[in-house]
Amino acid sequence: GIRVENLQNIPGKTEEDEGKINIGAVLRVTPIKDVKTMIQAFGFAKEKDDRLKLWIMGPWEEDREYAEECFQLVSDMEIPDVVFTGRINIRDYLGRMDVTILTSISEGQPLTILESYAAHKPVIATDVGNCYGLIYGESDDFGAAGIVTHIMNIEEIAQAMLDMAANEKMRLEMGETGYRRVMEKYRVEYMQKTYWEIYRDFAEQMGLEWKEESVKLPDKEK
Protein backbone atom coordinates (compact mmCIF):
# COMPACT_ATOMS: atom_id res chain seq x y z
CA GLY A 1 0.00 0.00 0.00
CA ILE A 2 0.92 3.66 -0.16
CA ARG A 3 0.49 6.72 2.01
CA VAL A 4 -1.27 8.94 -0.50
CA GLU A 5 -0.91 12.04 1.67
CA ASN A 6 2.87 11.95 1.11
CA LEU A 7 2.31 12.92 -2.53
CA GLN A 8 -0.26 15.64 -1.99
CA ASN A 9 0.51 19.32 -2.71
CA ILE A 10 3.66 18.57 -4.68
CA PRO A 11 5.24 21.16 -7.02
CA GLY A 12 3.82 21.29 -10.55
CA LYS A 13 5.35 22.27 -13.88
CA THR A 14 8.04 24.93 -14.14
CA GLU A 15 9.07 27.37 -16.87
CA GLU A 16 11.54 24.72 -18.05
CA ASP A 17 8.59 22.44 -18.82
CA GLU A 18 6.71 24.94 -21.00
CA GLY A 19 5.73 23.34 -24.31
CA LYS A 20 7.00 19.92 -23.23
CA ILE A 21 5.22 16.62 -22.63
CA ASN A 22 7.21 15.13 -19.76
CA ILE A 23 7.40 11.35 -19.55
CA GLY A 24 8.84 10.19 -16.24
CA ALA A 25 10.38 6.84 -15.31
CA VAL A 26 11.05 6.29 -11.61
CA LEU A 27 13.41 3.33 -11.39
CA ARG A 28 16.83 1.88 -10.79
CA VAL A 29 18.79 1.85 -14.03
CA THR A 30 19.19 -1.93 -14.23
CA PRO A 31 18.54 -4.58 -16.91
CA ILE A 32 15.30 -5.82 -15.28
CA LYS A 33 13.80 -2.36 -15.86
CA ASP A 34 14.67 -2.63 -19.57
CA VAL A 35 15.68 1.00 -19.85
CA LYS A 36 17.16 0.37 -23.30
CA THR A 37 13.77 -0.48 -24.78
CA MET A 38 12.35 2.64 -23.15
CA ILE A 39 15.08 4.79 -24.69
CA GLN A 40 14.64 3.27 -28.15
CA ALA A 41 10.86 3.70 -28.01
CA PHE A 42 11.27 7.29 -26.88
CA GLY A 43 13.68 7.93 -29.75
CA PHE A 44 11.11 6.82 -32.32
CA ALA A 45 8.28 8.73 -30.61
CA LYS A 46 10.41 11.87 -30.34
CA GLU A 47 10.89 11.88 -34.12
CA LYS A 48 7.12 12.23 -34.51
CA ASP A 49 6.40 14.59 -31.61
CA ASP A 50 9.20 16.96 -30.68
CA ARG A 51 7.43 18.06 -27.49
CA LEU A 52 8.36 14.81 -25.76
CA LYS A 53 10.96 14.79 -23.00
CA LEU A 54 12.05 11.68 -21.09
CA TRP A 55 13.07 11.87 -17.44
CA ILE A 56 14.81 8.75 -16.13
CA MET A 57 14.72 9.31 -12.39
CA GLY A 58 16.62 7.10 -10.01
CA PRO A 59 20.04 5.71 -9.11
CA TRP A 60 22.28 4.20 -11.76
CA GLU A 61 25.22 3.10 -9.57
CA GLU A 62 23.87 -0.42 -8.94
CA ASP A 63 24.89 -1.63 -12.40
CA ARG A 64 27.33 0.92 -13.78
CA GLU A 65 28.08 -1.09 -16.91
CA TYR A 66 24.41 -1.24 -17.89
CA ALA A 67 23.95 2.44 -17.05
CA GLU A 68 26.88 3.37 -19.28
CA GLU A 69 25.33 1.32 -22.08
CA CYS A 70 22.11 3.30 -21.64
CA PHE A 71 23.98 6.61 -21.73
CA GLN A 72 25.80 5.46 -24.87
CA LEU A 73 22.54 4.38 -26.52
CA VAL A 74 21.13 7.87 -26.11
CA SER A 75 24.31 9.28 -27.63
CA ASP A 76 24.45 6.78 -30.51
CA MET A 77 20.81 7.39 -31.44
CA GLU A 78 21.34 11.15 -31.05
CA ILE A 79 18.14 11.47 -29.03
CA PRO A 80 17.56 14.93 -27.53
CA ASP A 81 15.63 15.60 -24.33
CA VAL A 82 16.62 12.52 -22.33
CA VAL A 83 17.53 13.37 -18.74
CA PHE A 84 19.14 11.00 -16.23
CA THR A 85 18.60 12.69 -12.87
CA GLY A 86 20.24 10.14 -10.60
CA ARG A 87 18.77 9.63 -7.14
CA ILE A 88 16.01 12.14 -6.36
CA ASN A 89 13.21 13.00 -3.97
CA ILE A 90 10.19 11.92 -6.00
CA ARG A 91 8.11 14.79 -4.58
CA ASP A 92 10.34 17.27 -6.39
CA TYR A 93 9.70 15.80 -9.85
CA LEU A 94 6.50 13.77 -10.05
CA GLY A 95 4.21 16.80 -10.23
CA ARG A 96 6.05 18.00 -13.35
CA MET A 97 5.30 14.83 -15.29
CA ASP A 98 2.44 14.43 -17.78
CA VAL A 99 2.68 10.64 -17.72
CA THR A 100 4.93 8.04 -16.12
CA ILE A 101 6.32 4.90 -17.71
CA LEU A 102 7.56 1.47 -16.67
CA THR A 103 9.07 -0.92 -19.23
CA SER A 104 10.21 -3.70 -16.90
CA ILE A 105 10.56 -7.32 -17.97
CA SER A 106 9.60 -8.46 -14.45
CA GLU A 107 7.70 -6.82 -11.59
CA GLY A 108 5.46 -7.65 -8.66
CA GLN A 109 3.14 -4.80 -7.75
CA PRO A 110 5.18 -1.73 -8.67
CA LEU A 111 5.14 1.03 -6.08
CA THR A 112 5.94 3.57 -8.79
CA ILE A 113 2.51 3.02 -10.37
CA LEU A 114 0.78 3.68 -7.05
CA GLU A 115 2.92 6.79 -6.53
CA SER A 116 1.91 8.03 -9.98
CA TYR A 117 -1.75 7.52 -9.17
CA ALA A 118 -1.39 9.37 -5.88
CA ALA A 119 -0.10 12.32 -7.92
CA HIS A 120 -2.96 12.03 -10.47
CA LYS A 121 -0.61 10.81 -13.23
CA PRO A 122 -1.50 8.19 -15.87
CA VAL A 123 0.90 5.32 -16.51
CA ILE A 124 2.33 3.42 -19.47
CA ALA A 125 3.49 -0.03 -18.33
CA THR A 126 4.50 -3.38 -19.76
CA ASP A 127 2.29 -6.38 -19.04
CA VAL A 128 4.26 -7.83 -16.13
CA GLY A 129 3.33 -8.64 -12.54
CA ASN A 130 0.17 -6.86 -11.51
CA CYS A 131 0.60 -3.92 -13.91
CA TYR A 132 -2.44 -4.91 -15.98
CA GLY A 133 -4.63 -5.10 -12.88
CA LEU A 134 -3.37 -1.79 -11.55
CA ILE A 135 -4.01 0.00 -14.83
CA TYR A 136 -7.29 -1.55 -15.95
CA GLY A 137 -8.70 -2.55 -12.56
CA GLU A 138 -9.14 -6.06 -11.22
CA SER A 139 -12.42 -5.64 -9.36
CA ASP A 140 -13.67 -2.16 -10.16
CA ASP A 141 -15.30 -0.45 -13.09
CA PHE A 142 -13.40 2.83 -12.84
CA GLY A 143 -11.83 2.41 -16.28
CA ALA A 144 -8.28 2.64 -17.62
CA ALA A 145 -5.66 4.61 -15.72
CA GLY A 146 -3.07 4.21 -18.44
CA ILE A 147 -1.92 1.97 -21.28
CA VAL A 148 -0.43 -1.53 -21.06
CA THR A 149 2.00 -2.77 -23.73
CA HIS A 150 3.79 -6.02 -24.44
CA ILE A 151 7.26 -6.53 -23.00
CA MET A 152 10.17 -5.22 -25.11
CA ASN A 153 7.82 -4.01 -27.85
CA ILE A 154 9.44 -0.79 -29.01
CA GLU A 155 6.71 0.06 -31.51
CA GLU A 156 3.87 -0.40 -29.00
CA ILE A 157 5.62 1.59 -26.30
CA ALA A 158 6.43 4.42 -28.72
CA GLN A 159 2.82 4.52 -29.87
CA ALA A 160 1.61 4.64 -26.27
CA MET A 161 3.85 7.66 -25.69
CA LEU A 162 2.43 9.36 -28.78
CA ASP A 163 -1.16 8.55 -27.83
CA MET A 164 -0.66 10.05 -24.38
CA ALA A 165 1.03 13.14 -25.81
CA ALA A 166 -1.73 13.70 -28.36
CA ASN A 167 -4.66 13.62 -25.96
CA GLU A 168 -4.51 15.86 -22.89
CA LYS A 169 -8.13 15.08 -21.99
CA MET A 170 -7.35 11.36 -21.94
CA ARG A 171 -4.27 11.92 -19.78
CA LEU A 172 -6.21 13.92 -17.23
CA GLU A 173 -9.09 11.45 -17.12
CA MET A 174 -6.72 8.51 -16.72
CA GLY A 175 -4.84 10.36 -13.99
CA GLU A 176 -8.08 10.88 -12.07
CA THR A 177 -9.03 7.22 -12.57
CA GLY A 178 -5.69 6.17 -11.11
CA TYR A 179 -6.16 8.49 -8.15
CA ARG A 180 -9.60 7.05 -7.48
CA ARG A 181 -8.23 3.50 -7.71
CA VAL A 182 -5.37 4.11 -5.31
CA MET A 183 -7.65 5.88 -2.85
CA GLU A 184 -10.21 3.07 -2.94
CA LYS A 185 -7.92 0.04 -2.92
CA TYR A 186 -4.24 0.71 -2.33
CA ARG A 187 -3.90 3.09 0.59
CA VAL A 188 -1.89 1.69 3.50
CA GLU A 189 -4.97 1.78 5.72
CA TYR A 190 -7.02 -0.26 3.24
CA MET A 191 -4.25 -2.81 2.74
CA GLN A 192 -3.80 -3.25 6.49
CA LYS A 193 -7.53 -3.88 6.87
CA THR A 194 -7.50 -6.35 3.96
CA TYR A 195 -4.60 -8.35 5.41
CA TRP A 196 -6.19 -8.31 8.86
CA GLU A 197 -9.37 -9.81 7.40
CA ILE A 198 -7.36 -12.52 5.60
CA TYR A 199 -5.55 -13.49 8.82
CA ARG A 200 -8.79 -13.42 10.80
CA ASP A 201 -10.55 -15.69 8.30
CA PHE A 202 -7.61 -18.09 8.30
CA ALA A 203 -7.61 -18.22 12.11
CA GLU A 204 -11.33 -18.96 12.13
CA GLN A 205 -10.88 -21.78 9.62
CA MET A 206 -8.17 -23.29 11.83
CA GLY A 207 -10.32 -22.95 14.93
CA LEU A 208 -7.95 -20.45 16.50
CA GLU A 209 -8.91 -17.49 18.64
CA TRP A 210 -8.23 -14.18 16.88
CA LYS A 211 -8.09 -10.79 18.48
CA GLU A 212 -7.02 -7.69 16.61
CA GLU A 213 -5.27 -6.29 19.65
CA SER A 214 -3.17 -9.45 19.87
CA VAL A 215 -1.43 -8.66 16.59
CA LYS A 216 1.93 -7.10 17.31
CA LEU A 217 4.98 -6.42 15.25
CA PRO A 218 8.08 -8.30 16.41
CA ASP A 219 10.39 -6.36 18.66
CA LYS A 220 13.49 -4.98 17.01
CA GLU A 221 16.68 -6.82 17.74
CA LYS A 222 18.70 -5.15 20.42
Model-identified regions with their sequence ranges:
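Conserved donor-binding/catalytic core segment of Leloir-type glycosyltransferases
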Residues: E15-K33, I39-F42, W55
